[in-house]
UniProtKB/Swiss-Prot annotation:
PANTHER family cross-referenced by the UniProt entry: INTEGRIN-LINKED PROTEIN KINASE, SERINE/THREONINE-PROTEIN KINASE TNNI3K-RELATED
Post-translational modification comment from the UniProt entry: Phosphorylation by PAK1 modulates ILK subcellular location by promoting its nuclear export.
List of residues that carry Phosphoserine: S186, S246
Keyword terms: Acetylation, ANK repeat, ATP-binding, Cell junction, Cell membrane, Cell projection, Cytoplasm, Cytoskeleton, Magnesium, Membrane, Metal-binding, Nucleotide-binding, Nucleus, Phosphoprotein, Repeat
Binding-site positions, ATP: N200, N202, H203, S204, H270, M272, N279, K341
Pfam family for this entry, one: PK_Tyr_Ser-Thr
Name under which the protein is recorded: Scaffold protein ILK
Source organism of this protein record: Bos taurus (Bovine)
Task of the protein: Scaffold protein which mediates protein-protein interactions during a range of cellular events including focal adhesion assembly, cell adhesion and cell migration. Regulates integrin-mediated signal transduction by contributing to inside-out integrin activation.
Subunit structure: Component of the heterotrimeric IPP (ILK-PINCH-PARVIN) complex composed of ILK, LIMS1/PINCH and PARVA; the complex binds to F-actin via the C-terminal tail of LIMS1 and the N-terminal region of PARVA, promoting F-actin filament bundling. Formation of the IPP complex is dependent on protein kinase C and precedes integrin-mediated cell adhesion and spreading. ILK also interacts with LIMS2/PINCH2 and with PARVB and PARVG which may substitute for LIMS1 and PARVA in the IPP complex; PARVA and PARVB compete for the same binding site.
Disulphide bridges, residue numbers: none
Record GO biological process: branching involved in ureteric bud morphogenesis; caveola assembly; cell differentiation; cell morphogenesis; cell projection organization; cell-matrix adhesion; establishment or maintenance of epithelial cell apical/basal polarity; fibroblast migration
Length: 452
């Protein structure tokens, strides 16, 4: 089968769907020129493929090597329906490429009059200069130039030249497609790993920042007592299910090193510059999580969990909490598969009871409805996002576990929280597990909250 980039270019929707259904495929990877599958589908006008990629979570504002977004390509090739679709999904209408051109520069230059009108109607700036001091309207033929100026003025735009600044995108994050070769290696040679700095050490092992094949990675070395052939076999069998590349809100395990030859069983995953949601909320990173960012994180997590809940069988021993959610370079929250416990890791022990549903603390895993229990954990994450506090921070894990399970200890919702979030939290934290919603039911609610 041809590669995914060819299938997207040619509009082979059936082949693209089959490729997307394989969880080991990463739809946000790039080719040699940094074109993602979405870039190619937008450039060639493949509407059905564009729709499919967006619905599966393709990044809308991803940039190729020349900093063109999919909107730049759709606009320059006059694919009006695709331009509309990208704008509907919040494409950055004034995204600047390496020459300082925005999508409107290209629509004007290539004579895509209708696309240019659509862009201006949606807020594209007619007077923004590129690196060479040219405005989009400078590129347009005279009749279109006058029309666009008139439209922009009606919409309240100031028609004075906006000089090019190298800082146009400084407040935003530039998202590049990921290296597509990373998901090809499941077994990794331990000797190829370059260890740069130890990040953390706890009961379950050591966490290191490293490099592998020119990429920044995180290396997780598991501490396992009495390593045996049987545990080694379980490790080999359980690892492949954690290599989920097909959803943007799930962070896959890239690969693993068996022990021996590695000193310990080892997992490799993508380096996340902001660390975990716990780091971002409680350990003073550089950016502020305002209400709209909090809703976006909640939506990201709900989408990731909705996807994981479609898998049959469910991935066992996955615990949802703020330490097991990672924050990507473009502020996307991703459920970390490297935090899933293996069958041989401390069975029966709970290390983050503050996020665990009461029934999961009281019963054996096989007697608990995992999907409902995950929804409770999500409600605690919502509480954490709006309060910026660690749940039950003044108690030990042992006390939390006992009090939540036996004494009805619950997070208290402080006054002043948005009534919508408050209501959602209460629904997700219903004492009756059977009455809690499913993740695919709360995704649309969070989408509405985001739009507001």
């Amino acid at each position: 089968m041809d590669d995914i980039f060819t299938q997207c270019r040619e509009g082979n929707a059936v082949a693209v769907r089959l490729w997307l259904d394989n969880t080991e495929n990463d739809l946000n990877q790039g080719d040699d020129h940094g074109f993602s599958p979405l870039h190619w589908a937008c450039r060639e006008g493949r509407s059905a493929v564009v729709e499919m990629l967006i619905m599966r979570g393709a990044r809308i504002n991803v940039m190729n090597r020349g900093d063109d977004t999919p909107l730049h390509l759709a606009a320059s090739h006059g694919h009006r329906d695709i331009v509309q679709k990208l704008l509907q999904y919040k494409a950055d209408i004034n995204a600047v490429n390496e020459h300082g051109n925005v999508p409107l520069h290209y629509a004007c230059f290539w004579g895509q009059d209708q696309v240019a009108e659509d862009l201006v109607a949606n807020g594209a700036l007619v007077s923004i200069c590129n690196k060479y001091g040219e405005m989009p309207v400078d590129k347009a033929k005279p009749p279109l130039r006058e029309l666009l100026r008139e439209r922009a003025e009606k919409m309240g735009q100031n028609l004075n030249r906006i000089p090019y600044k190298d800082t146009f995108w400084k407040g935003t994050t530039r998202t590049r497609p990921r290296n597509g070769t990373l998901n090809k290696h499941s077994g990794i040679d331990f000797k190829q790993l370059n260890f740069l700095a130890k990040l953390n050490e706890n009961h379950s092992g050591e966490l290191w920042k490293g490099r592998w094949q020119g990429n920044d990675i995180v290396v997780k070395m598991l501490k396992v007592r009495d390593w045996s052939t049987r545990k080694s076999r379980d490790f080999n069998e359980e690892c492949p299910r954690l290599r989920i590349f097909s959803h943007p809100n799930v962070l896959p395990v890239l690969g693993a090193c068996q022990s021996p030859p590695a000193p310990h069983p080892t997992l490799i995953t993508h380096w996340m510059p902001y660390g975990s949601l716990y780091n971002v909320l409680h350990e003073g990173t550089n950016f502020v999580v305002d209400q709209s960012q909090a809703v976006k994180f909640a939506l990201d997590m709900a989408r990731g969990m909705a996807f994981l809940h479609t898998l049959e069988p469910l991935i066992p021993r996955h615990a949802l909490n703020s330490r097991s959610v990672m924050i990507d370079e473009d502020m996307t929250a991703r459920i970390s598969m490297a935090d899933v416990k293996f069958s041989f890791q401390c069975p029966g022990r709970m290390y983050a009871p503050a996020w665990v549903a009461p029934e999961a603390l009281q019963k054996k895993p096989e007697d608990t409805n995992r999907r409902s229990a995950d929804m409770w954990s999500f409600a605690v994450l919502l509480w954490e996002l709006v309060t910026r506090e660690v749940p039950f921070a003044d108690l030990s894990n042992m006390e939390i576990g006992m009090k939540v399970a036996l004494e009805g200890l619950r997070p208290t919702i402080p006054p002043g929280i948005s009534p919508h979030v408050c209501k959602l939290m209460k629904i997700c934290m219903n004492e009756d597990p059977a009455k809690r919603p499913k993740f695919d039911m709360i995704v649309p609610i969070l989408e509405k909250m985001q739009d507001k």
